[in-house]
Amino acid sequence: MKVRKHDLEDMLRFNPQVLEFHFSDSDLYLELEGKFSQKLIIHCYEYFDRKLLDIVSLGETNQVHSQEKTINLIQKAIDKTKELGKQFVGTPTLIVHPGGYSLNQLPEQDIQKMKNSIVDAVKKLDVTGVNFLLENMPPYAWFFGGRWISNCFLSASDMVDYCEQTGL
């Protein structure tokens, strides 16, 4: 069941088996009281400080974080997921969008660079103690009131390649 801290008590009345928190950047400071009999899923924030996270970013812009900054911010979400996970049953899960965003169509060589960098980027993360899942996105994502193009992790072959390269 999707939940935010302010409606947690109301949602617990439905006796869900899983609680999924959709993080915003302020949720790095989220504190929960008590223990929970549910499994925990955290949906990582898509943006931080008004800029999109993009794990395959080809460079920082005024609207997209660099790959290095994105990896750092995702690691913080992983660490927070592990911390909160101690209050839940089972191994916590973190869902992350793979990025590859642009406002305009990119040249095929840039798209291939993004696709080729995804496994190396994920390997830079310490995902020990969490189920780390990349979520495929639709071809057009709606961020900041604009229609962004998702350039990678769209096709079944992208996902199969990722799973084979990471041993999933």
Positions of PLM-derived features:
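Active-site acidic/histidine proton-transfer and metal-coordination neighborhood
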Residues: G59-L168
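N-terminal pre-domain/capping segments
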Residues: M1-D79, Q165-G167
